[in-house]
């Protein structure tokens, strides 16, 4: 579910990389209105969607969930072992939920962004693509359970303020500090030292003012 928004072309490109999966792409028209009767908005705070809810407001317009229910039931009748899952974004693509069909109870389980992050983390760890002390960054609105799970997986958990710019800012600042220390230990030049000092002062001012130049 591209929420009739910014990720439409990205989703269309991703489909080519899904191998043998049967992919259904929906809500891909800007003319129908971004986030209108689609996307994650109506899924906020939900963990379970019962089948009968899809015939009532507001979820009766949720095309992605309806298609997941239909496909899940079809696979259940065929005794198929394949999973029926979805990816539901919001209009600008910075949030993603994963609805999963539960064939045992004929319902849809909603995995939110925090849950998805932990699933990705556990997959990376299982495939030895993480290291001890790996940074796990989330916001003050994130689930405490997600932070506990990340700590249990051996990550260093850091919280930041809400919003994309703060996550990017935190990543930028950490990268800058690492490079700064590296160059200090490898370059002995007065002019270069003055430049680093000016940069440090600029970063400090930006942090104090919560602004970006």
Q: Model-found features: residue ranges?
A:
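Phosphate-binding chemistry for phosphorylated carbohydrates and sugar-nucleotides
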Residues: 2-213
């Amino acid at each position: 579910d591209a929420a009739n928004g910014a990720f439409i072309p990205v989703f269309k490109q991703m489909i080519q990389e899904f191998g043998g999966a049967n992919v259904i792409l929906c809500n891909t028209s800007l003319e129908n209105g971004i986030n209108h009767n689609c996307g994650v908005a109506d899924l906020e705070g939900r963990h379970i969607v019962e089948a009968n809810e899809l015939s009532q407001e507001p979820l009766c317009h949720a095309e992605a969930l309806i298609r997941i229910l239909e496909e899940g039931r079809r696979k259940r009748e065929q005794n198929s072992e394949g999973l029926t899952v979805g990816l539901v974004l919001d209009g600008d693509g910075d949030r993603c939920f994963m609805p999963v069909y539960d064939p045992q109870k004929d319902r849809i389980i909603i995995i939110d962004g925090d849950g998805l992050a932990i699933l990705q983390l556990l997959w990376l760890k299982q495939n030895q693509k993480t290291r001890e002390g790996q940074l796990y960054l989330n916001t003050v609105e994130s689930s405490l359970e997600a932070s506990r799970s990340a700590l249990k997986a051996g990550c260093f958990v850091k919280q930041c303020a809400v919003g994309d710019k703060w996550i990017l800012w935190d990543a930028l600042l950490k990268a800058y500090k690492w490079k700064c220390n590296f160059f200090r230990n490898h370059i002995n030049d007065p002019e270069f030292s003055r430049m680093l000092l000016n940069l440090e002062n600029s970063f400090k001012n930006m942090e104090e003012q919560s602004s970006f130049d």
